[in-house]
Amino acid sequence: MLNLMPVAWPINTSGMSVKIVDASIHEIQLKTRMPFKYGIATMTEVPMVFVTVEAEVDGKTATGTSSDLLPPKWFTKVPDDPIEKEIADMLRVIRRALGQALGQVGDSAFDLWRILYEKQAEWAESSQVPPLLAHFGTSLVERALIEATCRANNQALGQAITTGLLGFDPGDVHPILKGQAASSLLPSQPLAKVQARHTVGLGDPLSANQITEDDRIDDSLPQSLDQCIKAYGLRHFKIKINGDIQWDLERLKSVAKTIVQHAAGDYAFSLDGNEQFQSITSFRDHWNQLRNEPELDSFFEHLLFIEQPLHRDVALDEALKTEFDQWPDRPAVIIDESDATLESLPKALAIGYAGTSHKNCKGIFKGIANACLLEHHRRNGNHTVMSGEDLCNVGPVAVIQDLAIMAMLGIESVERNGHHYMAGLSQFPHRTQEQILEAHDGLYKTSPLGWPTLAITNGEIDLSSVNKQAFGTGFDLDLGVFDEISMSEE
């Protein structure tokens, strides 16, 4: 457990140096407890990788670990690409980023990230690798580096940003913020709790009586939407649509009926457009048909925002500004997959979007800078949205680091689905399970079958243990129980 020490503010990072001296990649194969259908993909099994770096931070040596699943059909959306190729492509960008980072020296973690980001971007452009995919690799190195820096100085993430330990400068990412300190644009304290915004996947059963005997799961966790609402006290939801108006209408009416019947009256939801539309005009027509359905009239009063309705190939076309301008009473629409580079959010705001999502796989410093930019625009009278979205995050590392950044950014409604599509930490070694329960009592609880599962009470996740950690697990993860894989790009 990290023993946080009081720190004077601000820290002077001049003369400081950060260097990555060693790294490794480990892997474990996981299976979902039920199929996760999102967009054009259905996830049933998936690799999880752990990236560990050893860093010299101002003369002190520390390690940091990051982790993520390798999800098909998200970083790239090529229907015909085999899953094996997509996994190989994801491993390629991770290996490339680590190769770029090894031996690299920066004045701070932020400075080193900037160097790595530019190198990875140059390589990606010359190799025709999409930036969203390329910087997945950057983000894994970045996360491990941030944890190492925080651990070397006994600071939690929020402290490390506001004290200047990480060297973060929002104006270096978004020039409009020049001269504004991150501490003046971010919450003064991390959130103690967040709302778990439950993913309603395209194929998820809505009621227990819809589950056939063959599909019924006997692992002590809820399976259908009504069971999840009762078990977790859920109040926030993320509902996926597929672009077919008749299917979406019937699905939304069924989802709405289930939520209204079982959830508290202060429920709220977002819609995920899953990149199903090619223009704002076509999405607006779809939206109007949904909105004009009498059975959904009161339900839509609880809408938070709409996420990425347009395909990434067209979503940031400047010509869309005219379509946005012609729709003054539009709901808040944000980007997600289109938020691929440092320039994506400013471009989206200029077109007419209300904001973006944060996912750790898109980058930590980028996400913090985006939060600062949105707060700047909010103070100038604009309605802005930064949402917290999930890419099936599970422990023992990924979901904790994800929650740490959400708490720091003050994002109160956070999509969570890793606990729903995976059976807690049941697939991990017993020692890893023990360490999680020891370090994160309150975040995890023991399931009736004896393994840790995310604790959600009254729809909320308690972040008390998360906010005490150096952006990580709070213990030294034993990587020897996982398979080490080569760092070579060959």
Label each PLM-derived region with a short phrase.
Residues 4-52:
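Short, Gly/Pro- and small/polar-rich lid/capping loops
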Residues 10, 380-382, 388-490:
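Flexible C-terminal active-site loop/helix
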Residues 61-164:
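Metal- or metallocofactor-binding catalytic centers and their adjacent structured scaffolds
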Residues 57, 69-70, 200, 362, ...:
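Glycine-rich beta-alpha junction loops
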Residues 122-286, 301-312:
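Active-site-facing alpha/beta catalytic cores
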Residues 42-44, 186-190, 325-327:
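Solvent-exposed alpha-helices and their adjacent loops that cap or buttress functional pockets
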Residues 47-57, 62-68:
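Short beta-strand elements
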Residues 238-399:
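Catalytic core of soluble alpha/beta enzymes
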